[in-house]
From Swiss-Prot:
GO MF term set: 3-phosphoshikimate 1-carboxyvinyltransferase activity
InterPro entries registered for this protein in UniProt: Enolpyruvate_Tfrase_dom, Enolpyruvate_Tfrase_sf, EPSP_synthase, EPSP_synthase_CS, RNA3'P_cycl/enolpyr_Trfase_a/b
Taxonomic source organism: Staphylococcus carnosus (strain TM300)
Membership in a protein family: Belongs to the EPSP synthase family.
Superkingdom field: Bacteria
Listed name of the protein: 3-phosphoshikimate 1-carboxyvinyltransferase
Length: 432
C-alpha cells in the first residue's frame, strides 16, 4: 500500500446512490455458505480485499466461487469434506478473517496456519487464542498473541465464557468453534457488540438461545446448518463517510439507499441526531437485518456532543469520521470509552488525532478517546492513512473543507473495504 492520491473536490454533494455491501455480513455469508454442503447465492456482497481473502481461504479448503455481476455463486462440498490446505492461509489486513477463522478452523479440526500482513502481525490475538484453548483447541501464536497462528486437530468442548472485552470478533470466534462442540457453550457479554453472527446463524438454520447479554449454543449445532441464499445490505460504516460529508459541506443533499440498520451498528445515526444533524430515515424494512434509505442535508449549526458507553460500541468503526464531524460543531465535544480504537488497523486514537491535527483540526487524544474543539482545515500538509482504510477515507472527506489540494499517502488502503469510495465521492461532488 504505497499509492499517494491527490484529492481536490468541491461541494455541494448531490445525488442518490447505494454503498457497497456490508463487510461484516459478507465475511459471515462466505463462511456460512461454505460450511453448508450444496449451492447457494450471495447477492450484493462486498468484493473488496478483506472479503476476497476470506473467499480465497475457503477456495483452498475446496469451495468453488463464481462471481457474476453483483452475485457470488457458492458450490461447497460442506465442512465434512474440506481439504487440508498445503499452504499458509493468508488473511491480509483482515482482523475479522484472522480471528473468526481461528475459531472456525479450530472447531473443524483442520491442520492449518493463519498468517496476515505486517499490520495484522501487530494486532493482539490472545483475546481469541485464550478462550479457544479453554475449549480444547490446539492453537498457538507468536508469544501466544500474534500471527502466524498454528492450528492442529483437537476435540472442541463447550465453554462458559464471560467476555473480558466487548468484541464481536472474539464472540464470533467462540460461536463458530462452538458449532462443532459436543457440549453447549454459554457466552456472557459485558456490552453491546454487533450481532451479525447471531442473526445469520438463525438465517442458516443454526439454533441459538439468546437471553439479554447471554448467548447459549447447543451441542453439535453444525449439523443443523442449511444451504441458504443471502442478500447483503449496504455497509453503514461505509455510508458514514458520506453522511458526514453531506452534513459538513454547504448545499449538500444526498440520499443513500439500502443501508443496513442493525441496531448494534447504527450508532452513527444516533450520534448525528444528538448533534442535531439534518438526517431522515425512510423506507425502513422490518427484518432480522433491517435496511433503510438515509437522506442527509448540510447542517451549519451542528451541536457538540459527549459520546460514551454503548453508543461508542455501536459506532466504533465510525469514530475517526465522527471526530472530523465534531470539529464542525459549534462547541467542544468529548469522545470516551473508545479504548478499542487502539487495536484496529492502526491505533486510531493516535492516527486520527495526528493526521487531522496536521491539517489544523483540534482533535486532542486522551487515553480512551478525544477532546475536540471547533476548528478549520488550515493548510494542506502531507498526510498518510498509515495503511488504515478508515483513516484514508476520513482524510479524503476532510479535504471537502478546503480549497487546497490534499495528497494522502498509502491511500490504496481503502481497497480493503471500499474500492469505489473515491469514484463515488467524485461523482456526487460533480453534481453540485
Amino acid at each position: 500500500m504505497t499509492k499517494t492520491e491527490t484529492i481536490n473536490l468541491r461541494g455541494p454533494l448531490k445525488g442518490e446512490f447505494e454503498v457497497p455491501g456490508d463487510k461484516s455480513m459478507t465475511h459471515r455469508a462466505i463462511m456460512l455458505s461454505s460450511l453448508a454442503q450444496g449451492q447457494s447465492v450471495i447477492t450484493k456482497p462486498l468484493l473488496a480485499e478483506d472479503c476476497l481473502r476470506t473467499m480465497k481461504i475457503f477456495e483452498l479448503l475446496g469451495v468453488n466461487f463464481d462471481i457474476k455481476d453483483d452475485k457470488v455463486f457458492v458450490d461447497s462440498p460442506g465442512y465434512q469434506n474440506f481439504k487440508t490446505p498445503h499452504q499458509s492461509l493468508y488473511t491480509g489486513n483482515s482482523g475479522t478473517t484472522t480471528r473468526i477463522m481461528a475459531g472456525l478452523l479450530s472447531g473443524i479440526g483442520i491442520q492449518s496456519v493463519l498468517s496476515g500482513d505486517e499490520s495484522i502481525g501487530k494486532r493482539p490475538m490472545n483475546r481469541v487464542i485464550d478462550p479457544l484453548k479453554e475449549m480444547g483447541a490446539s492453537i498457538t501464536g507468536i508469544e501466544n498473541n500474534y500471527t502466524p497462528l498454528v492450528i492442529n486437530p483437537s476435540d472442541i468442548q463447550g465453554i462458559d465464557y464471560k467476555m473480558p472485552v466487548a468484541s464481536a470478533q472474539v464472540k464470533s470466534a467462540i460461536l463458530f468453534a462452538s458449532l462443532f462442540s459436543k457440549t453447549a457453550s454459554t457466552i456472557t457479554e459485558i456490552g453491546i457488540t454487533r450481532n451479525h453472527t447471531e442473526t445469520m446463524f438463525e438465517h442458516y438454520n443454526i439454533p441459538l438461545k439468546i437471553n439479554g447479554n447471554v448467548i447459549q449454543t447447543i451441542p453439535d449445532a453444525i449439523t443443523s446448518i442449511k444451504v441458504k441464499d443471502f442478500t447483503v445490505p449496504g455497509d453503514i460504516s461505509s455510508a458514514a463517510f458520506f453522511i458526514v460529508a453531506a452534513l459538513i459541506t454547504p448545499g449538500s443533499d444526498i440520499t443513500i439507499h439500502n443501508v443496513g440498520m442493525n441496531s448494534t451498528r447504527s450508532g452513527i445515526i444516533d450520534i448525528v441526531k444528538e448533534m442535531k444533524g439534518n438526517i431522515e430515515i425512510i423506507n425502513q424494512t422490518n427484518t432480522s437485518e433491517p435496511t433503510a434509505s438515509i437522506r442527509i442535508q448540510y447542517t451549519p449549526d451542528l451541536q457538540p456532543a459527549e459520546l460514551s458507553g454503548e453508543l461508542i460500541t455501536r459506532a466504533i468503526d465510525e469514530i475517526p469520521i465522527v471526530a472530523l464531524l465534531c470539529t464542525q460543531a459549534n462547541g467542544s465535544s468529548v469522545i470516551k470509552d473508545a479504548e478499542e480504537l487502539k487495536f484496529k488497523e492502526t491505533n486510531r486514537i493516535e492516527t486520527t488525532s495526528d493526521e487531522l491535527g496536521l491539517l489544523g483540526f483540534e482533535v486532542h487524544p486522551t487515553d480512551d478517546g478525544f477532546i475536540i474543539h471547533p476548528s478549520k482545515f488550515e493548510h494542506a500538509a502531507s498526510v498518510s492513512s498509515y495503511t488504515d482504510h478508515r483513516i484514508g477515507m476520513t482524510l479524503a472527506i476532510a479535504s471537502l473543507l478546503s480549497d487546497e489540494t490534499l495528497a494522502i499517502r498509502n491511500f490504496d488502503s481503502v481497497n480493503t473495504s471500499f474500492p469505489e469510495f473515491l469514484p463515488l465521492l467524485k461523482s456526487i461532488s460533480q453534481k453540485g
